[in-house]
């Protein structure tokens, strides 16, 4: 069993608190506005019509989970930087990490199902299993989403056990002084942490990769068909393939970066209050913010709604 024990002094310089806190707060505000906007748009439509198409329902679930994730990370970073005594209490520390992992798992699952749904919608494949999934996916999606939340909760609950522990030593003497200082001692079971964490993200990441592979294969086949046809020009199907591939690749790359940052932050292998850990916190807050901006920019309906929102805000400020 590999254990990492980290002795961490609280901040030696004020800028080590201010700079990460300001940058993370800005990213969090952008993410809360972006994901909150998407949630309100689709949530209002759901309340008005009592139901949503499967794609829009997935967008609502994904944006709402990212909104919760963004708010929770903002709270966690605020406590870790400004209220370290409360945050580094062992039970509180485990609670923060377990909820962060749960929301990250849900976020990845919802994003994976969204990409799988659009893959099934766009790709034409004659395989019997693929055709069966294409027919059944709309009816099965509510159960799949519920199962994903249950799996995420079950796996994240293990992070409240003895994988992560933090202790406080208040009797560390200060040289040339009669006083003592406080040190936080983080004991991390890295093997258990890595196993549980990557077990939780393996299946949805595999779904991401499979969806991207099928889209690329289908696009290649469609391109060859168009080259052999009389026109040889891009059509709506090719545009849909290219757009879906770009979106899936964008989401996959950003999530892998975010997943690595979250693991490094949780394991404290670079120091609990180091510059690198602060960088990981910034990446984790920037990820859902960037994803919300990406969704708004690539979705025509959300772009129009955002322009209307900006117009109303502009008129309100001119009063």
Curated annotation (Swiss-Prot):
Membrane-spanning parts: 18-38, 67-87, 98-118, 137-157, 190-210, 252-272, 282-302
Locations listed in the record: Membrane
Primary subcellular site in the record, as a coarse category: membrane
Glycosylated residues, chain numbering: 169, 178
Topological domain spans for side Cytoplasmic: 39-66, 119-136, 211-251, 303-319
One CC-aspect GO term: membrane
Keywords tagged on the record: G-protein coupled receptor, Glycoprotein, Membrane, Receptor, Sensory transduction, Taste, Transducer, Transmembrane, Transmembrane helix
Membrane topology: Multi-pass membrane protein
Similarity comment: Belongs to the G-protein coupled receptor T2R family.
Matches recorded under PANTHER family: TASTE RECEPTOR TYPE 2, TASTE RECEPTOR TYPE 2 MEMBER 40
Protein's name according to its UniProt entry: Taste receptor type 2 member 40
Organism: Mus musculus
């Amino acid at each position: 069993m590999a254990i990492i024990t980290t002795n961490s002094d609280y901040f030696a310089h004020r800028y080590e608190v201010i700079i990460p806190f300001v940058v993370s707060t800005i990213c969090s505000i952008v993410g809360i506005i972006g994901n909150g906007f998407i949630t309100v748009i689709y949530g209002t439509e759901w309340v008005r019509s009592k139901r949503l198409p499967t794609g829009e329902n997935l967008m609502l679930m994904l944006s709402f989970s990212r909104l919760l994730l963004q708010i929770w990370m903002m709270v966690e970073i605020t406590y870790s930087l400004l209220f370290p005594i409360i945050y580094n209490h062992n039970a509180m520390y485990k609670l923060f990490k377990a909820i962060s992992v749960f929301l990250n798992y849900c976020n990845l699952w919802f994003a994976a199902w969204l990409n799988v749904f659009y893959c099934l919608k766009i790709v034409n494949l004659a395989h019997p299993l693929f055709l069966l999934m294409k027919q059944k996916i709309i009816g099965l999606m509510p159960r799949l989403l519920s199962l994903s939340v249950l799996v995420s909760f079950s796996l994240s609950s293990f992070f409240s056990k003895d994988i992560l522990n933090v202790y406080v030593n208040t009797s560390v003497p200060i040289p040339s002084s009669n006083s003592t200082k406080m040190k936080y001692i983080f004991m991390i079971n890295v093997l258990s942490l890595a196993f549980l964490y990557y077990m939780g993200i393996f299946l949805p990441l595999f779904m991401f990769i499979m969806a991207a592979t099928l889209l690329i294969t289908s696009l290649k086949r469609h391109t060859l068909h168009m080259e052999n046809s009389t026109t040889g020009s891009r059509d709506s199907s090719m545009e849909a393939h290219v757009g879906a591939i770009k979106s899936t690749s964008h989401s996959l790359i950003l999530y892998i970066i975010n997943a690595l940052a979250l693991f490094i932050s949780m394991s404290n292998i670079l120091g609990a209050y180091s510059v690198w850990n602060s960088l990981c916190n910034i990446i984790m807050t920037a990820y859902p913010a960037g994803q919300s901006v990406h969704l708004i920019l690539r979705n025509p309906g959300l772009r129009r709604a955002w322009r209307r929102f900006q117009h109303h805000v502009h008129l309100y400020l001119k009063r």
